[in-house]
Structure formats: structure tokens, C-alpha cells
């Protein structure tokens, strides 16, 4: 009887760990949003056949730009794509698998798929710089064509942005 309870507890913990490790939309935003948008564009008859899904995806990719275009390139949806893992998208879509799960599978095949990110537009007048990631602080400086020599910690980047803020916030108005 104790063994049975132990098996149930271990099974529950394994499920709990698996759900906490599941891919979130913000971890792979371009993939999730593109797959959702593509899936919504398909009619019911196309959704059932993975070959038709692949053909529709290639047609869909011809109209995409920027990050979505790069996503299509990684999957093999473009003529100039070097590799093709399109069946990793089309078959799960034909099974009605959610976009997050599809992107999780795609990430296992090609990690750079989830490295694609949309550019964040940061309003410096309303944002709390302390809550931003260092990557976003570096992006602000990079957008201004400024550097932060010797900046190692988040506080250093915030200090540099605060120094330059008057110069750039006036020109944006």
C-alpha cells in the first residue's frame, strides 16, 4: 500500500515539474505568434492533411517580413531555406496541437527558433529602468548609438542612460 502511495506522489511531482518547465509564449514569442496566426488562417479541410499544411505554410511565408520571415527560413518554408523541418510543424498542426507545444518541439530540433524576439518599444518617460533586463538597457544605448565602456552591472547601465536621457528625450519630442 505504501508503494502505491509513493508511485502516485512521484507521478504527481513529475507532472508538476513538467508543467512548470513547459514553454511559455514570452520564451518563444515569434514562433508562438506566427504558428497561431498561421493556424487561424487555415480552413478545416486543410488542417486535416499535413501535406496541404506544408503547401499553405510555404505560401504564407512568401508574404512574411522581418522576424516571421526568419522563422520561415529556419523551418524550411522558403525556397532559399538551407534546411527543412517543416514536418515538425505540419504534422502536429494536423493533430490540433497547441502552438506552445509545437514551438517546444521545434526548439528541440533547432534552438535558434526561440532566439527570435520582437523588438520592444520602450517609453523612457514612463518605464522604471530598474525593472528592465540588462539586454533591454543595452538595446536603449545601442539605439542611441552610445556605448557604456566599463559597465558591468545593471546599475552602471541605468546610470549611463540617466546621463544621456536629457540629450535623447528632447530630440524624440
Curated annotation (Swiss-Prot):
The gene is Manf. Residues 1-22 form the signal peptide. The keyword Transport does not apply. It comes from the Eukaryota. Belongs to the ARMET family. InterPro entries: ARMET-like, ARMET_C, ARMET_N, EF_Hand_1_Ca_BS, SAP_dom_sf. Gene3D superfamilies: SAP domain, Saposin-like. Required during the maturation of the embryonic nervous system for maintenance of neuronal and cuticular connectivity. Essential for maintenance of dopaminergic neurons and dopamine levels. One of its GO terms (cellular component) is endoplasmic reticulum. Its main location: secreted. This is Mesencephalic astrocyte-derived neurotrophic factor homolog. Disulfide bonds join 28-114, 31-103, 61-72, 148-151. GO terms for biological process: dopamine metabolic process; dopaminergic neuron differentiation; neuron cellular homeostasis; neuron projection development; synaptic transmission, dopaminergic. It is found in: Secreted. Keywords: Developmental protein, Disulfide bond, Secreted, Signal.
Amino acid at each position: 500500500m505504501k508503494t502505491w502511495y509513493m508511485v502516485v506522489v512521484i507521478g504527481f511531482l513529475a507532472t508538476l515539474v513538467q508543467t512548470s518547465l513547459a514553454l511559455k509564449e514570452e520564451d518563444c514569442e515569434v514562433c508562438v505568434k506566427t504558428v497561431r496566426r498561421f493556424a487561424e488562417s487555415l480552413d478545416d479541410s486543410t488542417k486535416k492533411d499535413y501535406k496541404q499544411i506544408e503547401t499553405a505554410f510555404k505560401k504564407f511565408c512568401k508574404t512574411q517580413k522581418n522576424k516571421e520571415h526568419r522563422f520561415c527560413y529556419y523551418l524550411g518554408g522558403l525556397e532559399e531555406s538551407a534546411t527543412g523541418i517543416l514536418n515538425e510543424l505540419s504534422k502536429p498542426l494536423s493533430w490540433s496541437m497547441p502552438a506552445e507545444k509545437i514551438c517546444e518541439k521545434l526548439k528541440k530540433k533547432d534552438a535558434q527558433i526561440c532566439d527570435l524576439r520582437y523588438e520592444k518599444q520602450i517609453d523612457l518617460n514612463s518605464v522604471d529602468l530598474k525593472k528592465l533586463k540588462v539586454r533591454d538597457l543595452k538595446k536603449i544605448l545601442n539605439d542611441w548609438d552610445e556605448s557604456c565602456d566599463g559597465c558591468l552591472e545593471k546599475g552602471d547601465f541605468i546610470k549611463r542612460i540617466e546621463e544621456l536621457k536629457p540629450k535623447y528625450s528632447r530630440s524624440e519630442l
